Amino acid sequence: MFKDELLASYRDGALDDLNQRFTLFEARGSHEMVTVGPVPFSSLCAHHLLPFHGVAHVGYIPDKWLVGLSKIPRVVEHFARLLQMQERMTTQIADYLDANLHPQGLIVLVEARHLCMECRGVKTSGAITRTSALRGVAKSSSEVREEFYRLLSR
């Protein structure tokens, strides 16, 4: 279960498989924000080896390329299937998409519940941790960020 499911991205060739399936299409005048989410995921906390689970939301503004929409959940799944910290996973998803898609702007928002917070230590049931990563114009433009969050609230 651990090797084949929960930690599947440690398998030799897992990143190569992801790269081969990362299909790009010419944007051809499509330069408005694209959002995908909520994308459900489960991962294992690198500190406590307890699960955390939640959803990821991705928004990007294409430059030259659009990505096949099913590829974004594949990217989330790939990075969730490693021993993780939510902050690192959020950054890894953003870095991968930025490096392979080269968008004008990119936002990744991850929301998760951590069993290490619910079952031990502070024992806070139901707390949601939110992390974000911004790239390109999303970092410098409040309008881009507002559009992303507005699209999420629909």
Predicted regions located by residue number:
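A domain-level signal for the structural core that forms small-molecule/cofactor-binding pockets
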Residues: 1-154
